[in-house]
Amino acid sequence: MNPYVRAIITSGLILGPIITMSSNHWITAWCGLEMNSLTMIPLIANKYQPRAIEASTKYFLTQAMASYLMLSAALMNMWYYGQWDMQLLTDNISCTTMTVAMSIKLAAAPFHFWFPEVLQGATVLTALLLTTWQKLAPLTILVQCSQNLDTTLLIALGMTSILIGGWGGLNQTQIRKIMAFSSIAHLGWMYAILTLSPKILLLTFYLYVAMTATTFLMINVLQTNNMSAIMISWTKTPFMNTMMLLNLMSLAGLPPLTGFAPKWLILQEFTKQRLSMFASMMITSSLLSLYFYLRMSYYTIITLPPTTCNYPLQWRLMTNIHTALATITPLATALMPLLPTLKAIP
C-alpha cells in the first residue's frame, strides 16, 4: 500500500472513533462513524482477492444500512422533541431504532450475519481491528444513551448473542470465524449489563480487547488459519503455544484468569438486581463457547500431528521479538488478582 494512502487510512481510523466519543451531537457522531467505516473498506479489500472484495462489499452494505437507521432515529427524535443532543434520546421508537442500528454495526445477534464472512475474508490484523477498535465508537454511543434504552430489549439481544455466538462456533474449523463468534458471544455479555452498569460494561470491553488482541497477534505470529495448522505450530514456538492455551482459557472465562473477572462482576450485578434467572440462562448459554475454546486448546497444546521423526521439534530460524504481544499477554491472563482495584476506578 502507498505510504500516503496508509497515512490517510491510519488517520481516519484514529480520528473517527475519537470524534464520535467526544461529540454530543448526532450529526457529529454520525460523521465519526462514517469516517471510521470508510477507512476500513480499503483495509479489508487490500488482498485483491475475490473473498476480500466480497467481504469489503458486505461490510460497506451493512454499515451503510446501520448508518441510515441511526440517522433515521436521530431525525425522528429531533422531529418530536427538537433535540439533537445524544443524551436526550427519549422517543421510544427512536431508542429501538438506534439500538438496532448499533447492533448491526457491532454485529450483535440476530444482526450478526455479515461478521463471520467479513472476518474470514480479511487479514488477521484487519480482523483484529474489526473485533476491537471498530466496536469502540458504537459502544460509546450506546453508553451515552444507556439511561433511555430498553433494558428488556438489551438483555434479550445479549442472551441471543451469547447463545448464537456459542452455537455458531461449534462446527467451525477456521480460526477467524471462531474468533468472530467469540466476539459475538462476548458482546452479548456487554449488552446484558449495558443499562444496569455502564462502568462494568467498559471494564468488560477493555479486558475483552486485551484478550482478543493477544489471540490475534499470536495467530499472526504462528501463521495458523485453521485447526489443522494450529496443531503443528507447537513445533515452531512451544512457549507461545503455552501462552495461547492460557489466553484461550481466559477468553472462555475460567478462573483464576482475567476473563473470569468481567463475567463475575456481571453475574454479581444481575443477582443484585434480582435477575437471577437471566444470570443462570447466560451461564448455561456460555457453556457452548467453553466447548470450542476447549477444543482449540486441545489442538493447540495437547495433540501432535503424525510424524516419523523421533524428535518432533522442527528446525527453525530465530523469531522476531514481539514487544506488543509481550506487553498485553499478562493483561489478558493475569489481571484477576487486581479485580478490586479495577472495580474501584471511577
Curated annotation (Swiss-Prot):
Enzyme class: translocase
Any Pfam family hit: NADH_dehy_S2_C
GO molecular function terms listed in the Swiss-Prot or TrEMBL record: NADH dehydrogenase (ubiquinone) activity
Reaction(s) this enzyme catalyzes, per UniProt: a ubiquinone + NADH + 5 H(+)(in) = a ubiquinol + NAD(+) + 4 H(+)(out)
EC number: 7.1.1.2
Chief localisation class: mitochondrion
Protein's cellular compartments: Mitochondrion inner membrane
InterPro entries, per database record: Complex_I_Subunit_2, NADH_DH_su2_C, NADH_UbQ_OxRdtase_chain2, ND/Mrp_TM
Keywords, alphabetical: Electron transport, Membrane, Mitochondrion, Mitochondrion inner membrane, NAD, Respiratory chain, Translocase, Transmembrane, Transmembrane helix, Transport, Ubiquinone
Membrane topology field: Multi-pass membrane protein
Positions of transmembrane segments: 7-27, 59-79, 93-115, 151-171, 178-198, 200-220, 242-262, 275-294, 325-345
GO CC, one annotated term: mitochondrial inner membrane
GO biological process assignments: mitochondrial electron transport, NADH to ubiquinone
Record's function text: Core subunit of the mitochondrial membrane respiratory chain NADH dehydrogenase (Complex I) that is believed to belong to the minimal assembly required for catalysis. Complex I functions in the transfer of electrons from NADH to the respiratory chain. The immediate electron acceptor for the enzyme is believed to be ubiquinone.
The family this protein is said to belong to: Belongs to the complex I subunit 2 family.
Listed name of the protein: NADH-ubiquinone oxidoreductase chain 2
Gene from which the chain derives: MT-ND2
